[in-house]
């Protein structure tokens, strides 16, 4: 079973979301998602300053197996991207919940967080797959 940190929120598309001290949210893909994709070769990062809606595809993770869209779990403005992934996309594999984060977003509607899954619900989703 994949590692599913309890403090994070999750989307049904296998993104995770962590609230930061400054009020922004860090987004990445889950350990389960990176296991399905395999070794990352490239991550197409969103543009800082871009405004996205929940469910918009805003990034692409390319692995040796496939390319997969990464969706915004909440609406808002992209305020930072993980530039380290340009040179080291494998961080998504080795540190999916730490150094392999993909972007940070300033949420425009925090009520959208209610539609995300907690760790228990995400684990149940994985068991059903």
From Swiss-Prot:
Its cofactor is (R)-lipoate. Residues 24-106 form the Lipoyl-binding domain. Binds 1 lipoyl cofactor covalently. One of its GO terms (cellular component) is cytosol. InterPro entries: 2-oxoA_DH_lipoyl-BS, Biotin_lipoyl, GCV_H, GCV_H/Fam206, GCV_H_sub, Single_hybrid_motif. Keywords: Lipoyl. The modification N6-lipoyllysine is found at residue 65. GO terms for biological process: glycine decarboxylation via glycine cleavage system. The glycine cleavage system catalyzes the degradation of glycine. The H protein shuttles the methylamine group of glycine from the P protein to the T protein. Belongs to the GcvH family. NCBIfam families: gcvH, PRK01202.1. The glycine cleavage system is composed of four proteins: P, T, L and H. This is Glycine cleavage system H protein. The lineage of its organism: Bacteria, Pseudomonadati, Pseudomonadota, Gammaproteobacteria, Enterobacterales.
